[in-house]
């Protein structure tokens, strides 16, 4: 006789949510959601939450709490992952030859802040002959925000 499947808990269901999906599911706004950083435990300010939202990373569920990752910790994590899990490095032409598809069709994250690159950012990276790095089965290169030097007033 087949075993009955255990119903998923609320937290297990939300484990696969991006921050945008979680906000819709909970029917709350970004500014009202209290979201701690998984790595440093500080509560993320509105700018950090907006950056996390734009990156389209999944919400972390730990100890019955939803958590994100602040930009400072995401930068540290991206650096550590590059150091430990970098597989190969090449320009977009090499990437396209390896995967058999145009870079615009690939999921590419920023090698510095883990943001999800837009189609135009991927095309810019290809035209500018930027380096693409394979880290944990995911291609990475710098996003527009990380490539652009900060303007000082």
UniProtKB/Swiss-Prot annotation:
InterPro entries noted in UniProt: E6, E6_sf
Alphabetized GO MF terms: DNA binding; zinc ion binding
Pfam families: E6
Keyword RNA-binding carried by entry: no
Top-level lineage group: Viruses
Chief location bin: host cell
Protein family: Belongs to the papillomaviridae E6 protein family.
Subunit structure: Forms homodimers. Interacts with ubiquitin-protein ligase UBE3A/E6-AP; this interaction stimulates UBE3A ubiquitin activity. Interacts with host BAK1.
Protein name in UniProt: Protein E6
